Amino acid sequence: MAKRKHQGKPAPSDRNFGELTHKFKNNIYGTNKGKIREAVLQRDLHAQLDWLGHATDKRVLDVGGGQGQLALYLAALGHHVTVIDISDEMLELARIRANEAGLCERMRFIRAPLQEIAQLSLGQFDLVMCHAVLEWLVDQRSAIDLLKAQVSPSGALSLMYFNHEAHLMANMVYGNFDYVQKGLKVKQKVGLSPNNPIKQADMAAWLEAAKLTIAQKTGVRCFHDYLRELNKADDDFDALLELELKYNRQEPYASIGQYTHLMLIPIN
């Protein structure tokens, strides 16, 4: 098995990816990892939201929306989408893509951190999305309360976060024993490696306190990151994606995806 470099966990701090915008575009969004993520999120949203693509009056908020891949997809379905991100560079790329697609009239772009959502007075939304953001924040628990406050009583929260248990398991599979023994911590920050993976037990406690119930749990990249032959993801991607989508909502696979995607409903 090829030994892979572990993904480090630096000292806690919120993260702005402005300086890594093009690296994100090439190393995440344009890769098999990005394709799996996009396919999983689209499938899950359609499975849980019967109005998707039909009720064009529905409002969507994408927090930490980055370059706007999913936001553009939802705007193309006819929905009004507000994208919030802390990075000017990310938002500019999203604006360019929205303009090229003729979607600017249905999209709004705001530069702000998640922590300032309440101050923006945007009202509540039928769908709030926050994908791959929490693991970069210091105060993850408070972020969940802020997100829930933006969800309408009949709305939903789509939350995706970096899975601590899967991160540990993957590094054991890769043979990074020292890294695991050190508690998945390194001294130096790694560019695209999340700062704070989230434990499933912690997330469960936070959701209970926030009065959010899980309507659907999905693992994202349940198999991709554990492949012994790294070239298989490229050589037979369609088969890999089909199997990811087939099993990633079933346990135990749903709990070993590198990311966990939750569709959450507020308890009113």
Predicted regions: what they are:
Residues R141-A156:
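A short glycine-rich, Lys/Arg-flanked "PGG" loop and its adjoining helix->strand segment in the class I
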Residues M129:
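A conserved beta-strand element that flanks and buttresses the S-adenosyl-L-methionine
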Residues Q69-E116:
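Class I SAM-dependent methyltransferase SAM/SAH-binding core
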